[in-house]
Amino acid sequence: MLLLARTGHMSAENANESDRDDQSLLERARDIQSAAHVPYSEYRVGAALETADGEVFVGCNLENANFSNSLHAEEVAIAEAVKSGHREFSRLAVSSDRRDAVTPCGMCRQTLAEFCDDDLRVLCDEGDGEEPTEYTLGELLPNTISEETLESE
């Protein structure tokens, strides 16, 4: 498992608990897909974002006839968490009803980078019965645009 490879010293008991927690977060992302408003693409996406203190916020995609005004599941989850006062996050799970290994798009990755460190764990659903593919935000979005990037000298 990728998580074990990164930490190297996690006990089997802790790894099993982490796997259960990851599956639980993925289930939250899968469950919220049913609330998606997708009359045009019929492509449902769900996201579950866990705060540093363990609270979970979910989001689904909301399409608009003018596609540029559509909201992505990750954006909705982030907005819910931020409006509730959260600014530190530990994990994100993303799931789609149409394809396995769905990852956040570039725009969502940049939005996540506004609030999350490069080590945010991103769990990408591989479908029922499969282990999720795990990335860090830094792996998905290297060389992010940040406040430091925009500072003038």
Regions flagged by a language model, labelled:
Residues 41:
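Active-site segments that bind and position negatively charged phosphate/pyrophosphate groups
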Residues 61-75:
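Compact, glycine-rich, soluble single-domain proteins
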Residues 53-64, 88-92:
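Glycine/charged-rich beta-loop-alpha catalytic/anionic-binding loops adjacent to active sites
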Residues 2-4, 8-38, 86-153:
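C-terminal binding/interaction regions
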Residues 51-53, 128:
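Short acidic-glycine loop/turn motifs at beta-strand connectors
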Residues 44-51:
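Short beta-strand scaffold segments in enzyme catalytic cores
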Residues 72-90:
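Short, solvent-exposed cationic patches
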